[in-house]
């Protein structure tokens, strides 16, 4: 059962009820709190585009608590984050794993955060193939190409040499918030909610 809290806001016209995500969106906060698939990506991309149309000069914050998911869906979010004019701040709450970690690192440099007890996990893309040998070969080439693309972006975002990224993403690589900071995946470990991150 998926319960979504409702908040009541008093206005001069009376009361207005919002689901919590719509209320957060008014403050330019987007929640990524699930596995990343096409539906989640479409929702995040739509919110980013909406907030850009509302005010292209004001920052957007994405709070991430995600085990990762589809590479193509994640890349749709990544490309939109880079495409829109507002700066996109990313904040890890809980866990940012796989594509979740990639999106965390994709935030505006200087505005990528994690809470003290959150974890970040990077690894190489997962995939499988079945069918004829040629189909398996095509799938293998594609996943290797995706791995190279993701590693290149991570190297650019973290400042780590590509060889270090390749080595460190070979297997599941878990990092504390402090370790993610040292690695360059984030820019600061947050202990208090301050205006500095907005």
From Swiss-Prot:
GO terms for molecular function: ATP-dependent peptidase activity; ATPase binding; serine-type endopeptidase activity. Belongs to the peptidase S14 family. It is found in: Cytoplasm. Cleaves peptides in various proteins in a process that requires ATP hydrolysis. Has a chymotrypsin-like activity. Plays a major role in the degradation of misfolded proteins. InterPro entries: ClpP, ClpP/crotonase-like_dom_sf, ClpP/TepA, ClpP_His_AS, ClpP_Ser_AS. One of its GO terms (biological process) is protein quality control for misfolded or incompletely synthesized proteins. Pfam families: CLP_protease. NCBIfam families: clpP, PRK00277.1, PRK12553.1. Transmembrane segments: none annotated. It catalyses: Hydrolysis of proteins to small peptides in the presence of ATP and magnesium. alpha-casein is the usual test substrate. In the absence of ATP, only oligopeptides shorter than five residues are hydrolyzed (such as succinyl-Leu-Tyr-|-NHMec, and Leu-Tyr-Leu-|-Tyr-Trp, in which cleavage of the -Tyr-|-Leu- and -Tyr-|-Trp bonds also occurs). Its EC number is 3.4.21.92. This is ATP-dependent Clp protease proteolytic subunit. Its main location: cytoplasm. Coiled coil: none annotated.
